Amino acid sequence: MYDIAPRRSGSRPGPGRDKTRRRSRFSAAGNPGVERRASRKSLPSHARRLELCLHERRRYRGFFAALAQTPSEEIAIVRSLSVPLVKTTPVSLPFSLDQTVADNCLTLSGMGYYLGIGGCCPACSAGDGRLATVSREALILAFVQQINTIFEHRTFLASLVVLADRHSTPLQDLLADTLGQPELFFVHTILRGGGACDPRFLFYPDPTYGGHMLYVIFPGTSAHLHYRLIDRMLTACPGYRFAAHVWQSTFVLVVRRNAEKPADAEIPTVSAADIYCKMRDISFDGGLMLEYQRLYATFDEFPPP
């Protein structure tokens, strides 16, 4: 029963009366009380992000479920989008560039490895002005005329000089073997005209299909392959596969045959003797030669993908 005894105006209820009123409210609710929801400020940041993501997913689930019932409307909606729904996709290494599409760029860094969309990539937009237009015909012409521009290819040729010294192999014979794979020269030419990146090139025998593999070593702690560079390399080198990998914190692009491929009849042969004679006039930088010696020692144990 309730206490109906009169009390003086302005007096406060006693502690017993206050407890009785609280108990009566809890009993009326039929449970021990209403649990207060934790405020967002009390949740960790990752929990708040997860809550927001779940809220957005529930918000748009019905819309996309309805679109899935009518493929024509779904395609029309996608075509009308001016900004991609997903701008990056994480990948794992080793990663084959054959898995890319025409507009994909590749970013490798300590923060992760992911494919981007060239049209929405700030790095690709910044590098557009530095990209030279290189067709397969232009690459073949550069390969045939390299004796006239041999100094421009000294970074590529210096690696062969170091490799010949390491294995006590005649440089002219090694040069003849690599000239038998013009695609390796194409990769060097494409990357050399591809912007600020200044990669190094290592040559290793291919135990599977013969010839040589090319390791493209990227300097620094990150690497970015412009979507046009990827497209040009894949187009210029049919029959070759490209795999991005990392070895001892250094990013590398491995270029190797994917089958026993005969010489391309469209590409004229180049005299190794003429190139060798011209190379003897080049004074290779001592720092570059030491760098190649260190890189070969580092990648001797690297298992190519």
Swiss-Prot record:
Residues 1-42 are annotated as: Disordered. Phosphorylated at serine residues in the N-terminus. This phosphorylation regulates the localization within the inner nuclear membrane. A zinc finger (CCCH-type) spans 105-224. One of its GO terms (cellular component) is host cell nuclear inner membrane. It is found in: Host nucleus inner membrane. Forms a heterohexameric complex with NEC2. Interacts with capsid vertex specific component 2/CVC2; this interaction directs the capsid to the host inner nuclear membrane to initiate budding. This is Nuclear egress protein 1. It comes from Human herpesvirus 2 (strain HG52) (HHV-2). The gene is NEC1.
